[in-house]
Amino acid sequence: MANTTSAKKATRKIARRTIINKSRRTQMRGAVRSVEDAIKKGDREAALKAMANAEPQLMRAAQRNIIHKNNASRKVSRLTHQIAKLAK
């Protein structure tokens, strides 16, 4: 339990940020899932559209320290490679 005023305030700020970060993480996961679903269906156009939405969300999440930047880059890279395979 926080004793000082500043520690209590920090606890409140952390709670607010946690709610916001959970929301952003959920949106990001949904965007990635939509790309993966389009890839499973073999629909390249839908996958490209979904990827255009998912990539900025992943990079924004990395920028805001919701996920690590290498994690975001790895996900973008893997999804891009899977979409490229659909063209073949």
From Swiss-Prot:
InterPro entries: Ribosomal_bS20 (IPR002583), Ribosomal_bS20_sf (IPR036510). GO terms for molecular function: small ribosomal subunit rRNA binding; structural constituent of ribosome. GO terms for cellular component: cytosol; small ribosomal subunit. Keywords: Ribonucleoprotein, Ribosomal protein, RNA-binding, rRNA-binding. GO terms for biological process: translation. Binds directly to 16S ribosomal RNA. Belongs to the bacterial ribosomal protein bS20 family. PANTHER family: 30S RIBOSOMAL PROTEIN S20, SMALL RIBOSOMAL SUBUNIT PROTEIN BS20C. This is Small ribosomal subunit protein bS20. It comes from Bradyrhizobium sp. (strain BTAi1 / ATCC BAA-1182).
